[in-house]
Swiss-Prot record:
PANTHER family: EG:EG0003.4 PROTEIN-RELATED, UDP-GLUCURONOSYLTRANSFERASE 2B15. It catalyses: glucuronate acceptor + UDP-alpha-D-glucuronate = acceptor beta-D-glucuronoside + UDP + H(+); 17alpha-estradiol + UDP-alpha-D-glucuronate = 17alpha-estradiol 3-O-(beta-D-glucuronate) + UDP + H(+); 16alpha,17alpha-estriol + UDP-alpha-D-glucuronate = 16alpha,17alpha-estriol 3-O-(beta-D-glucuronate) + UDP + H(+); 17beta-hydroxy-5alpha-androstan-3-one + UDP-alpha-D-glucuronate = 5alpha-dihydrotestosterone 17-O-(beta-D-glucuronate) + UDP + H(+). Its main location: endoplasmic reticulum. Disulfide bonds: none annotated. It comes from Homo sapiens. It holds the Pfam family UDPGT. Expressed in many tissues. Present in liver, prostate and testis. Keywords: Endoplasmic reticulum, Glycoprotein, Glycosyltransferase, Lipid metabolism, Membrane, Signal, Steroid metabolism, Transferase, Transmembrane, Transmembrane helix. GO terms for biological process: estrogen metabolic process; steroid metabolic process; xenobiotic metabolic process. This is UDP-glucuronosyltransferase 2B15. The chain crosses the membrane at residues 495-515. The gene is UGT2B15. The keyword Cell cycle does not apply. UDP-glucuronosyltransferase (UGT) that catalyzes phase II biotransformation reactions in which lipophilic substrates are conjugated with glucuronic acid to increase the metabolite's water solubility, thereby facilitating excretion into either the urine or bile. Essential for the elimination and detoxification of drugs, xenobiotics and endogenous compounds. Catalyzes the glucuronidation of endogenous steroid hormones such as androgens (testosterone, androsterone) and estrogens (estradiol, epiestradiol, estriol, catechol estrogens).
Length: 530
């Protein structure tokens, strides 16, 4: 750690000692890539407020860099997985998800998706075991006496560490496939009549056939789809804790769920007291652009610019796709800044410049920006909402199709399919978004909603972490549903009892009526004989 950061860290610690004793120690179980961007924003704010933050990460981590100086502590544990192997494996999974998973039928798509999820969670399971079964590491962390754990729910293990150390924990999450973690671990409510199942690409305004589709999705995810090998994870948790338990039961002990969306993005739905929405917490005002980039932007004149990025995980694409996209971009009057790390397309127009990296937030906040071509990652969408920029979505994998579906439903975006789109499809979508004022009006409405909050998303996220530290948890916000079985939660036992009571009463009345009828019949026969 550099002398500068050492001094900063010591000053923070001293301020903590001389303050009212509100500084705490936070242990973090992160997830890579865009998830880390959100998590890091929260952690940096916690450090600014005087808290001691330690990130537990493996030696194979691709983004959490232990060599960079930072006030955030890194506790790196060894794993048999190498950084290159893990990164290559994850990129192969993504490549198969984008180009290999067939969408021809519902069953084939989600069956292939389940295989990819199992592959991913096999790596997660390995990393969790390497951490938890490292006795030296566990002893060191136990002696550190952390006050709280902040974990990304997408990567299980943070809740297991919290159980081992007997400390409260919070989750950060966008979503899990089929809302598996939210439903089974958090007890979230998703009425299928008006809440679209994630990845169904539906809105909350569903016609009858769409509600049927939504119900089929829900039943499939609830009773058939398994996001990971349940037995493997449940057995591992039971062995480590020394008692029968499940991953979902352990997840259910989370004090708070910090969901990385907000009502500018989400469709209205019920949620629990220990859930808060902190979407866009990483967004901030735009900074000045580098000189060369600013000159290029200014050269666009009244036509303005288009920002194009498919995110940090997709830096390359096929030559055919690149040429098709470049051909479309060459036909618009706007200047285009394209984040691209592949071979220069032959059809690249003079209005388009390629960059290996873009200051995306600063470009989206520039007054000359007219549109944003995006893969639909939550972070990028929130930057577009924050700055009020209409979008053309080219969703690739994970939540991106669903994210773009939300923006389309709110009238702030159009989408094209990377597998089937032509140059004309992209060109028409771009022209519509740029020239039709309704898209700008709709995204500005979302932007105003986003900015009109009683507390900024980042402040709200940090508040709940500090709240849990101050009160040693937030049990008063945890619904009793976590203590009920599936049968009790759905009141099936009560319904069965009431039905049994009704059936008993009907049975008794029927028997009584039959008894009376027989008596009367006997008397009638007796009178006839007499």
């Amino acid at each position: 750690m550099s002398l500068k950061w050492t001094s900063v860290f010591l000053l923070i610690q001293l301020s903590c000692y001389f303050s009212s004793g509100s500084c705490g120690k936070v242990l973090v179980w992160p997830t890579e890539y865009s998830h880390w961007i959100n998590m890091k924003t929260i952690l940096e704010e916690l450090v600014q407020r005087g808290h001691e933050v330690t990130v537990l990460t493996s030696s194979a981590s691709t983004l959490v860099n232990a060599s960079k100086s930072s006030a955030i502590k890194l506790e790196v544990y060894p794993t048999s997985l190498t950084k290159n192997y893990l990164e290559d494996s994850l990129l192969k999974i993504l490549d198969r998800w984008i180009y290999g998973v067939s969408k021809n039928t519902f069953w084939s798509y989600f069956s292939q998706l389940q295989e990819l999820c199992w592959e991913y969670y096999d790596y997660s399971n390995k990393l969790c075991k390497d951490a938890v079964l490292n006795k030296k590491l566990m002893m060191k962390l136990q002696e550190s006496k952390f006050d709280v754990i902040l974990a990304d729910a997408l990567n299980p293990c943070g809740e297991l560490l919290a159980e081992l150390f007997n400390i409260p924990f919070l989750y950060s999450l966008r979503f899990s496939v089929g809302y598996t973690f939210e439903k089974n671990g958090g007890g979230f409510l998703f009425p299928p009549s008006y809440v679209p199942v994630v990845m169904s690409e539906l809105s909350d305004q569903m016609i009858f056939m769409e509600r049927i589709k939504n119900m089929i999705h829900m039943l499939y995810f609830d009773f058939w789809f398994q996001i990971y090998d349940l037995k493997k994870w449940d057995q591992f948790y039971s062995e480590v804790l020394g008692r029968p338990t499940t991953l979902f039961e352990t997840m259910g002990k989370a004090e708070m769920w910090l969901i990385r969306t907000y009502w500018d993005f989400e469709f209205p739905r019920p949620f629990l007291p220990n859930v808060d929405f902190v979407g866009g917490l990483h967004c901030k005002p735009a900074k000045p652009l580098p000189k060369e980039m600013e000159e290029f932007v200014q050269s666009s004149g009244e036509n303005g610019i288009v920002v194009f990025s498919l995110g940090s995980m997709i830096s390359n694409m096929s030559e055919e796709s690149a040429n098709m996209i470049a051909s479309a971009l060459a036909q618009i009057p706007q200047k285009v800044l394209w984040r691209f790390d592949g071979k220069k397309p032959n059809t690249l127009g003079s209005n388009t410049r390629l960059y290996k990296w873009l200051p995306q937030n600063d470009l989206l906040g520039h007054p000359k920006t007219k549109a944003f071509i995006t893969h639909g990652g939550t972070n990028g969408i929130y930057e577009a909402i924050y700055h009020g920029i209409p979008m053309v979505g080219i969703p690739l994998f994970a939540d991106q199709h669903d994210n773009i579906a939300h923006m389309k439903a709110k009238g702030a975006a159009l989408s094209v399919d990377i597998r089937t789109m032509s140059s004309r499809d992209l060109l028409n979508a771009l022209k519509s978004v740029i020239n039709d004022p309704v898209y700008k009006e709709n995204v500005m409405k979302l932007s105003r909603i986003h900015h009109d909050q009683p507390m900024k998303p980042l402040d709200r996220a940090v508040f709940w972490i500090e709240f849990v530290m101050r009160h040693k948890g937030a049990k008063h916000l945890r619904v009793a549903a976590h203590n009920l079985t599936w049968i009790q939660y759905h009141s099936l036992d009560v319904i069965a009892f009431l039905l049994a009571c009704v059936a008993t009463v009907i049975f008794i009345i029927t028997k009584f009526c039959l008894f009376c009828f027989r008596k009367l019949a006997k008397k009638g026969k007796k009178k006839k004989r007499d």
